[in-house]
């Protein structure tokens, strides 16, 4: 029999622990009130004869109290209750000392590998983690209802970002960068007026990105289409200067050449400013800003020519990469690039196909950009095309008072994820039991999400002026609350999920790619989506269904369930759970079949979803990759490529750093295993990671099969 402790761990049942607990209480009562050895034995026998495979520690304690009362040992029962209450108070005390000291001494491996873009050796990152540990502790002990904290500990659900929950800040957003650049903003009490050139616009954009990142915990996105007009301003400025200086001496075509040369230099410098500042800035979160640059063109845009130039330069610089400390060009993790495929650039003879060809070449070498099909996105979002917030979170369509769709300047309140495989384990193939338990746990998730919502309710705009007062999300008055932005679907709040593959395997015995598994998996997805739509109607809050990235959660849920339920083939034995609705990473399936199959699930998971294919080095077979991009445009909303982009600082090896049989990263050329002497970049879960991963995610990365 396994005993499930309060933190979700499963330990072997030990009758001696019951005997010791009762004996301790026995010592504090009068002799005639003590339980005899026979009475203690009867209590133990009763528990053991229940024949349970698993029992909660609280249930054992309840039984002990009940049995002591039955034999009229009231004083002893009272002492036992006091003992139990005292232990509960001890658990309520501060629990952060060991984890914080372990972090400072670099001994807290689990925390160090929680986020692959945070280097816990750095003092600045350690400060963020220390604050995060305090926040987690307060959240668990004081801020969340006990049943939500318990559900989190037992792996029933995951209350994301508890390390920031003590403050009224939110998850991710689409910055209203056009508004801020055109109308000005304020940072650190200083007025920033509308830029007069492209270079200044790029500098201001990076300053905004840093300020925004320091006042939220999730990703942010910037639509680069708003910078086209500033490149035009630079063009007009250069032309005026050169004409004033050389107008009577040079022909117009020579003047135009001079203008273009200066413009190209400014374009290169401006884009370089964005790329290098994002990769060298350190926010208060202890990492570079988690930012996505959205690269798209609109046919009726008066600055389409300039925006095409900006996209081309961004792609060229990303293809080149950024030099590491050894002076070698490597793949940067940020900014994430998302490139939009539309009718004029989908490699079907369109005017801007040349940009897509460059994007594909860049993806083959640097993994970014990822691709959004404008055609498929319009089908899912009422004819609109807009950026994900960060890596994969999508807003729901929303109209302002004039009936105009608005996406920029909106945000996500937070996420709670449900552990689907655990429900499948408990249901043991019984569908009636499964659906009943799923609904019970969905209600728990709703309650946890409402905790997120209530934490933001009543927040004053002064908490983050860059967000609420100076244009990133709104232009509220000082002291005004943000409440109106939390209702009516203006912002979203997300139900995440993980492990559709494992759940289907448990309930149907097959993968979701098999017909029986496919039907069941889709039914589950639709059920989850229906729950969010129902909650949305009940509360007037923008609930949405979101495919959880699960960088550390893929390991956490699997570890908890293995401890509680043992080793289960294709479920807990792997050391990780599969991301959202994705096909098992080990399953042999070709790129086109995988993308087509997963597109059906993306269309349901409209609050957030992304699909990937694993590819070898395609730098000498770009045509094949172009055929995949064409397929993406016609078949799936959002997709990305995973390849390898590594470098060994010891021997200069430029290729794939492998994961050896001991689950360690190792240079195949010289055997170097020192993380500090290698650059490894992998697709973590929608974005790239470069500071290594926890044991579960590392196993998942190792087991990924090629799809092309």
Name each region found by the language model.
Residues 86-90, 96-489, 510, 514-680:
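Conserved catalytic cores of very large enzyme subunits
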Residues 477-478, 485, 489, 495-496, ...:
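Core of folded catalytic or high-affinity ligand/protein-binding domains
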Residues 1-107, 702-707:
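Charged, amphipathic alpha-helical regulatory modules used
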Residues 669-708:
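Long insertion/accessory domains within large nucleic-acid-processing enzymes
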Residues 493-506, 526, 683:
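Contiguous, well-ordered alpha-helical segments that form the cores/surfaces of helical PPI scaffolds
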Residues 34, 55-58, 491, 515, ...:
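Short, solvent-exposed positions on alpha-helices
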Residues 18, 22, 227, 231, ...:
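Buried hydrophobic packing segments
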């Amino acid at each position: 029999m396994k005993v499930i402790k309060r933190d979700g761990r499963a330990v072997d049942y030990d009758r001696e622990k019951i005997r010791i607990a009762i004996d301790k209480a026995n010592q504090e009562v009068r002799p005639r009130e003590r339980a005899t050895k026979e009475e203690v034995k009867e209590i133990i026998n009763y528990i053991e004869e229940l024949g349970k495979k698993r029992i909660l520690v609280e249930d054992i304690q309840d039984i002990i109290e009940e049995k002591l009362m039955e034999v009229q040992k009231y004083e002893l029962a009272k002492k036992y209750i006091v003992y139990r209450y005292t232990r509960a108070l001890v658990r309520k005390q501060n629990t952060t000392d060991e984890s914080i000291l372990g972090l400072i001494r670099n001994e807290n491996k689990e925390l160090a590998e929680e986020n692959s873009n945070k280097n816990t050796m750095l003092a600045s990152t350690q400060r963020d983690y220390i604050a995060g540990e305090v926040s987690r502790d307060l959240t668990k002990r004081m801020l969340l209802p006990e049943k939500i904290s318990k559900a989190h500990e037992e792996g029933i659900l995951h209350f994301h970002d508890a390390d920031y929950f003590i403050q009224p800040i939110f998850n991710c957003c689409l910055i209203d960068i056009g508004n801020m650049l055109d109308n000005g903003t304020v940072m650190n009490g200083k007025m920033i007026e509308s830029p007069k050139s492209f270079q200044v616009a790029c500098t201001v954009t990076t300053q905004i990105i840093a300020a925004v990142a320091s006042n939220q915990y999730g990703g942010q996105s910037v639509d680069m289409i708003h910078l086209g007009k500033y490149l035009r301003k630079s063009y007009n400025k250069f032309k005026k200067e050169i004409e004033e200086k050389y107008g009577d001496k040079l022909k117009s075509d020579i003047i135009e050449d001079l203008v273009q040369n200066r413009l190209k230099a400014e374009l290169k410098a401006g884009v370089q400013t964005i790329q290098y500042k994002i990769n060298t800035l350190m926010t208060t979160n202890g990492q570079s800003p988690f930012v996505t640059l959205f690269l798209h063109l609109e046919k009726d845009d008066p600055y389409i020519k300039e925006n095409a130039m900006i996209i081309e330069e961004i792609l060229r610089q990303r293809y080149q990469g950024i030099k590491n400390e050894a002076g070698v060009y490597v793949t940067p993790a940020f900014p994430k690039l998302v490139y939009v495929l539309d009718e004029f650039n989908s490699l079907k003879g369109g005017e801007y196909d040349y940009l897509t060809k460059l994007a594909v070449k860049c993806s083959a070498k640097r993994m970014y950009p990822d691709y959004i099909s404008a055609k498929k996105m319009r089908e899912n979002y009422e004819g609109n095309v807009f950026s994900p917030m960060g890596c994969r979170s999508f807003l729901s369509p929303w109209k302002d008072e004039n009936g105009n769709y608005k996406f920029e300047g909106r945000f996500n309140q937070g996420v709670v994820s449900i552990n689907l495989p655990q429900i499948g384990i408990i249901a043991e193939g019984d569908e009636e039991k499964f659906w009943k338990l799923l609904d019970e746990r969905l209600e728990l998730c709703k309650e946890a999400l409402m905790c997120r919502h209530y934490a933001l309710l009543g927040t004053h705009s002064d908490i983050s002026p860059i967000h609420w007062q100076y244009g990133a999300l709104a232009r509220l008055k000082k002291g005004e609350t943000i409440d109106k932005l939390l209702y009516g679907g203006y912002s979203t709040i997300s139900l995440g999920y993980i492990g559709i593959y494992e759940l289907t395997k448990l309930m149907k015995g097959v993968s979701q790619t098999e017909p029986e598994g496919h039907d069941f998996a889709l039914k589950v997805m639709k059920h989850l989506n229906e729950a969010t739509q129902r909650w949305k109607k009940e509360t007037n809050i923008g609930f949405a269904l979101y495919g959880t990235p699960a960088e550390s959660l893929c390991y956490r849920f699997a570890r908890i369930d293995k401890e509680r339920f043992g080793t289960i083939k294709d479920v807990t034995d792997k050391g990780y759970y599969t991301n959202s609705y994705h096909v098992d990473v080990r399953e042999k399936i070709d790129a086109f079949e995988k993308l087509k199959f997963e597109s059906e699930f993306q269309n349901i998971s409209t609050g957030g979803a992304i699909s990937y294919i694993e590819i070898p080095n395609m730098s000498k077979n770009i045509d094949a990759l172009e055929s995949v991009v064409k397929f993406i445009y016609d078949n799936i909303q959002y997709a990305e490529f995973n390849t390898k982009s590594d470098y060994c600082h010891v021997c200069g090896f430029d290729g794939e750093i492998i994961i050896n049989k001991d689950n360690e990263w190792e240079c195949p050329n010289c055997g170097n295993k020192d993380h500090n002497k290698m650059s490894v970049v992998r697709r973590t879960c929608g974005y790239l990671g470069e500071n290594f991963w926890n044991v579960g995610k590392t196993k998942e990365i190792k087991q990924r099969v090629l799809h092309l």
